[in-house]
Amino acid sequence: MKQEIQIRCKNNKKSIYVAIGSTLSDVFKQLNIKMAYGPVCAKVNNKVEGMNFRLYHNKDIEFLDMTSGSGSRNYTRTLFFILCKAVHDLFPRSYVVIDIPVSNGYYVDINIEREVTIDDVTQIRQRMQEIIDAAMPIKRHEVPTEEAIRMFSQKGDEAKAKLLKSAGSLYTTYYQIDDYVDYYYGSLLTNTSQIYLFGLEKYYVGLLLRIPDLKTPDILPEMTRQDKMFSIFKEQHQWQNIVGVRTVGDFNEIVEAGGGTDLINVSEALQEKKISRIADEIASRKDIKLVLLAGPSSSGKTTTCKRLSIQLVANGLKPLQISLDDYFINRDQTPRDENGEYDYESIYALNLKLINEQFRALFRGEEVELPKYDFQIGVSKPSGKKLKMQENNVLVVEGIHALNPELTAHIPDRQKFRVYVSALTTILLDDHNYIPTTDNRLLRRIIRDYKYRGVDARESIHRWPSVRSGENKWIFPFQENADAVFNSAMLFELAVIKQQAEPLLEQVPENCEEYSEAYRLRKFLKYIKPIPNKDIPPTSLLREFLGGSSFRY
């Protein structure tokens, strides 16, 4: 008698019986579900798996398409695989580094012992399309980890071998197209023909690989230059090469050798040096009356603001800190989003008229009374706090909209200095697996929300898509307006954050939507060796999230 298992599908609320060992692709065909952009993967008991994943027990399943974060990541990883194979086919002695997300794509470094030309890019793009058109199966293999480590070591891929040693797993999954094999952190598509849209062009000395838009997957987002952000990434990479930490495997080797404290000290010194340089530049421009700091959630804006203020004092200036949170309009006047909820992320939730009036009055030497927003009742009130600028005073204003030109439209640009703060993670898992900068910030937010706001990891993960949507609309479009970009990410921070984040992520129940993201983050953190936080100074930006800061928030 043929043995069967029960599958409950969330997409159509149906339950069916399938043969033991059926793949997710088999199940999808039996269910006869229609999806415009998929499926590309599925949640199996709220863990994301590829469509070639086999089922041996009763499962709850939800198929995902390109409009989901997991689906988009699956598609992107598959594109990385096809790109790496195409480069290998054309330049067998080359190596590829999938580097950083930038300009609505991913920057890719290719070493072919000379600078990459436009003709090279054309050849690579054509070879990628040939691989896609050939409809090559993408095979999934699961082998003992020791075997995978030997295989990648023999290929000369020591970064991948180091990473797999760090994971501590008994078995490792790797993928194969034709005779080319690679390892990816996460599942892939099952056939190269499922890639239907991509872009590839020359970008600086490397390539820019472009992927479909998450919300409208049949469109490639327009490439926008992000020269300032790119320069910060490359500067960080140069420093990492000096200290010998490019990948997680490199990092773990240093930690195991007892070098964790040195990494902390050097990273902290580098950040202080960068903040000092920004303060020096502000002090050198005598017309500056307003310093504006903006950045996405959990980028460390507040601590950056405090440390920058200290450095401004060291330059003979007298900073006056103002929070844009006190300039919210009354709740009943606040604009609403597409779901009918109050949209506090909107710039129009702020009293723009009052901001410009008060700032200009301060610059004229007049006294103003600052507002105070009561978040409990949603009303703006006079604070009783009066402010008047004296000689050498400079306003330091922090908030998500600080770089938006509309915020201070009536203040001359010559009086403004704009600082963009973000956590731009530059360490790689290995050459073909980058670490999303959003993961770094989400982990910061999870531990901060739990420690200071009484919000558990499940709720923080649940709110994150809404936060990201607001950032994409109100923050990221203005980051290139910055006069200075400050990278708040620390080379060692994931090794410290994991110790507080892992227990919180483990508390997310398996039967909730947020479990898949919590599981993904836990799986990612297992690659990283921990470092105790006792050597992190009280003025560290990370203390804003970890606790133990000497600053008052």
Briefly describe each language-model feature range:
Residues 286, 409-553:
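Conserved NTP phosphate-binding and transfer environment spanning the P-loop NTPase/kinase superfamily
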Residues 333-376:
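Conserved nucleotide-sensing/catalytic segment adjacent to the nucleotide-binding pocket
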Residues 304, 308:
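Hydrophobic positions on the alpha1 helix immediately C-terminal to the Walker A/P-loop
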Residues 1-102, 113-114, 126-130:
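Ubiquitin-like/PB1-type beta-grasp interaction modules and other compact soluble beta-rich domains
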Residues 291-293:
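Hydrophobic anchor at the beta1->P-loop junction of P-loop NTPases
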Residues 314-332:
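Short beta-strand-centered segment that lines the nucleotide-binding/catalytic pocket of NTP-utilizing
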Residues 301:
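Conserved lysine of the Walker
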Residues 53-56, 60-72, 86, 95-273, ...:
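Auxiliary tRNA-acceptor-end handling modules of aminoacyl-tRNA synthetases
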